[in-house]
From Swiss-Prot:
Upper classification of the organism: Bacteria, Pseudomonadati, Pseudomonadota, Gammaproteobacteria, Vibrionales
Pfam families named among the record's database cross-references: ABC_tran, DUF3744
Presence of the UniProt keyword Cell inner membrane in the record: yes
Binding-site residues for ATP 1, renumbered to this chain: G37, P38, S39, G40, S41, G42, K43, S44
Annotated protein name in UniProt: Putative ABC transporter ATP-binding protein VPA1482
Matches recorded under PROSITE patterns: ABC_TRANSPORTER_1, ABC_TRANSPORTER_2
GO terms under cellular component: ATP-binding cassette (ABC) transporter complex
Keyword Cell cycle set for record: no
Enzyme class (EC, first level): translocase
Membrane topology according to the record: Peripheral membrane protein
Length: 579
């Protein structure tokens, strides 16, 4: 046995009620487990208890016991925790300590006073394990998201700990890089026999490689401790607002019964011949029509080129239009230039060449403040946007800057907080929120300004399925009923599939596609070029012999959209807060 929580509870110093309640969990040596649950369910808190951040960096009250290799951790100092558990954080930038990759990997060895003669081969061997041996002199801050993950992983592997804890390792990664990360974790697990604990929202992506168990948490309690096959065959994921794999959703929509003994945790192990007639009949009965594209142009981009360093172009001769009332996505791998487009539209940086106009007006003629009256941008990292201590004040900030009367501000802020599932937290300090809740605060602070063009940069990062569905269904309603134009910058294929109608694809700084979303998602070669992957919906259609993959995906989207609109009057239960 490696890890055991026995009747373990924890209450943050700043909260009245415990965040973890009577946890009983046993993890055997060499197991690979995944912990899932809604935002604020206690997943990350459990991880912080395991790696010693609680109680050493984060104060609170504990009861019960946590043992690692049979030793009670209560008397452990931080050094004793780090000898046993290595952690790769969701925000890898906050984990770097060295000026170069080599220095960062060597940090733990330097703390142990390892000689340079012994240190160099250890650093090089560890870097090779994660395919970084040719990059030891580069700065970790200059790397892509996937490369940063590998640097963080190398930094803990060099210390040869027995337990590896990954806190949402896929949150900021494009699909192909995410797959590679899961493969690296799985290879390490098989080759070293280390105990692996993964905390993650993206269950389908984690199940790219097999895991032993899935732990489902809600409200600080363990709801289920079972196998991947059993949880996918049960209603638990839907009941607790966890996003199930796309192929499972499609099979259920088609009327297929999913049983645990059918091994549903992988599309390759499912008895698809058994489901084939049912799926084909479901599709044959469809009348899927692609959505109509509005005619009026809101944003026109022509020949946009920009370089950060004057040498390599971050964007090169990019042209596209955004129609008024559209819901579009900009796709591409980490570092492809997607976020550069946002910065140029905002006016934070100026294009080297090319033009942008909105409602026929050249954006270069507008100040950043004037642009902000027309364009609202929700950044990927909520901590980069938040400037106030209290939630209400943060959401009201933009309206107060516009000189609106306080009575009107209060009414508008309360309306948006209610729509975003944050009304009950309006008098809370922002630091008492989870990462996902902070994300919703930033979205609320932009929505309250009623922009003509709303840009969401990776809106699902740190969000669970229930809450991002609630949020994006609300934005979808604004788009449908009020004509708000929405542009999502993302590499979350599931999100793009569910909500957007057209995809602008950027690869290596160039525009490689501007087409209906289902057409893009039916082009494996194009997706591969952009470091994206086909969805399991496309793979399912192919495996059951449906040639019109475009139509199959559109039918599924239409059915899902109809379900969302039926539920649009329902209020989703807001996530629980954590400090």
């Amino acid at each position: 046995m490696t890890i055991e929580f026995s009747n373990f509870s924890f209450r943050y110093e700043s909260l009245d009620k415990p965040t973890l309640k009577n946890i009983n969990l046993r993890i055997e040596k060499g197991e690979k487990i995944v912990i899932i649950g809604p935002s604020g369910s206690g997943k990350s808190t459990l991880g912080q208890c395991l790696n010693g951040l609680i109680p050493h960096a984060i104060k609170g009250e504990t009861s019960g016991t946590l043992t690692i290799y049979g030793q009670d951790t209560a008397p452990f100092d931080m050094h004793q925790y780090t000898e046993q558990v290595g952690t790769v954080l969701q925000d890898t930038d906050s984990q770097f300590v060295g000026l170069s990759i080599g220095e960062d990997i060597a940090f733990a060895l330097e703390n142990q006073l390892t000689s340079n003669i012994d240190m160099y081969p250890l650093v090089k061997a560890t870097a090779k394990m994660v395919d970084l041996e040719q990059m030891l002199d580069r700065s970790p801050h200059d790397l892509s998201g996937g490369q940063k993950q590998r640097v963080s992983l190398a930094g803990i592997l060099v210390d040869d700990v027995d337990i590896l804890l990954f806190d949402e390792p896929l949150a900021a990664l494009d699909p192909k890089t995410g797959k590679k990360t899961i493969e690296i974790i799985d290879d390490l697990h098989r080759e070293t026999g280390k105990t692996i604990v993964i905390i993650e929202h993206r269950l389908e992506d984690v199940l790219h490689r097999s895991v032993d168990r899935i732990i489902l948490m809600e409200s600080g309690e363990i709801i289920a401790d079972t196998t991947p096959d059993e949880i996918l065959a049960s209603p638990l994921l839907e009941d607790y607002g966890i996003r199930e794999p796309l192929y499972i959703s499609a099979l259920k929509e088609a009327g297929c019964a999913i049983e645990g003994d059918a091994k549903p945790s992988s599309l390759t192990t499912l008895p698809l011949e058994q489901y084939k007639p049912t799926v084909q009949a479901w599709f044959d009965g469809s009348t899927a029509q692609p959505p109509k594209t509005p005619a009026e142009t809101l944003l026109e981009v022509r020949g946009l080129t920009y370089s950060y360093d004057g040498e390599k172009n971050a964007l090169e001769d990019v042209s596209f239009d955004i129609k008024r009332g559209e819901f579009v996505s900009v796709l591409g791998k980490n570092g492809s230039g997607k976020s550069t487009i946002t910065k140029l539209i905002m006016g934070v940086i100026e294009a080297d060449s090319g033009s942008m106009s909105m409602n026929g007006q050249d954006l270069n003629e507008l100040t950043i403040f004037e642009r902000s009256q027309k364009v609202g941008v929700v950044m990927q990292n909520p901590n980069h946007m938040i400037s106030h201590h209290m939630i209400f004040d943060e959401v009201a900030f933009g309206l107060r800057n516009r000189g609106i009367k306080e009575k009107q501000i209060e009414a508008k802020v309360l309306e948006v907080l209610e729509l975003c599932g944050l009304s009950k937290y309006r008098h809370w300090p922002i630091e008492a929120l989870s990462y996902g809740q902070k994300k919703r605060v930033t979205i609320a602070s932009i929505l309250v300004l009623e922009p003509e063009l709303l840009i969401l940069d990776e809106p699902t990062a740190g969000q669970d399925y229930r809450n991002y569905t609630s949020m994006l269904s609300f934005i979808e309603k604004l788009n449908r009923e009020l004509g708000v134009t929405v542009m999502i910058i993302s590499h979350d294929m599931h999100l793009v599939l569910e909500y957007t109608t057209r995809s602008i694809v950027i690869a290596d700084s160039k525009l490689v596609a501007d087409a209906p979303m289902t057409q893009v998602f039916s082009s494996p070669e194009l997706l591969d070029q952009a470091n994206l992957t086909t969805t399991s919906l496309f793979d399912l259609a192919t495996k059951v012999g449906i040639e019109d993959t475009n139509g199959f995906m559109q039918h599924f989207i239409n059915v899902e959209k109809a379900h969302r609109q039926q539920k649009s009057g329902e209020v989703n239960q807001p996530e629980k807060a954590v400090a």
